[in-house]
């Protein structure tokens, strides 16, 4: 059970980072 929760946190964290990177990249593309 603990391992499953860890996996969920890793997935959510990865998705959050991916979204953040995409957002920053899009903003940079629009600004420049």
UniProtKB/Swiss-Prot annotation:
Subcellular location: Plastid, Chloroplast thylakoid membrane
GO BP terms, alphabetized: photosynthesis; photosystem II stabilization
Pfam families: Ycf9
Record carries keyword Protein transport: no
Signal peptide coordinates: none
A GO term from the CC aspect: photosystem II reaction center
Transmembrane spans: 12-32
UniProt KW keywords: Chloroplast, Membrane, Photosynthesis, Photosystem II, Plastid, Reaction center, Thylakoid, Transmembrane, Transmembrane helix
InterPro entries per UniProt: PSII_PsbZ, PSII_PsbZ_sf
UniProt-listed SUPFAM superfamilies: PsbZ-like (SSF161055)
Membrane topology note: Single-pass membrane protein
Protein family per UniProt: Belongs to the PsbZ family.
Subunit structure: PSII is composed of 1 copy each of membrane proteins PsbA, PsbB, PsbC, PsbD, PsbE, PsbF, PsbH, PsbI, PsbJ, PsbK, PsbL, PsbM, PsbT, PsbY, PsbZ, Psb30/Ycf12, at least 3 peripheral proteins of the oxygen-evolving complex and a large number of cofactors. It forms dimeric complexes.
Function: May control the interaction of photosystem II (PSII) cores with the light-harvesting antenna, regulates electron flow through the 2 photosystem reaction centers. PSII is a light-driven water plastoquinone oxidoreductase, using light energy to abstract electrons from H(2)O, generating a proton gradient subsequently used for ATP formation.
Protein name per Swiss-Prot or TrEMBL: Photosystem II reaction center protein Z
Organism of this sequence: Euglena anabaena (Euglenaria anabaena)
Gene behind the chain: psbZ
């Amino acid at each position: 059970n603990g391992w499953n929760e860890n996996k969920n946190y890793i997935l959510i964290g990865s998705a959050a980072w991916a979204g953040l990177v995409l957002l920053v990249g899009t903003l940079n593309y629009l600004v420049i």
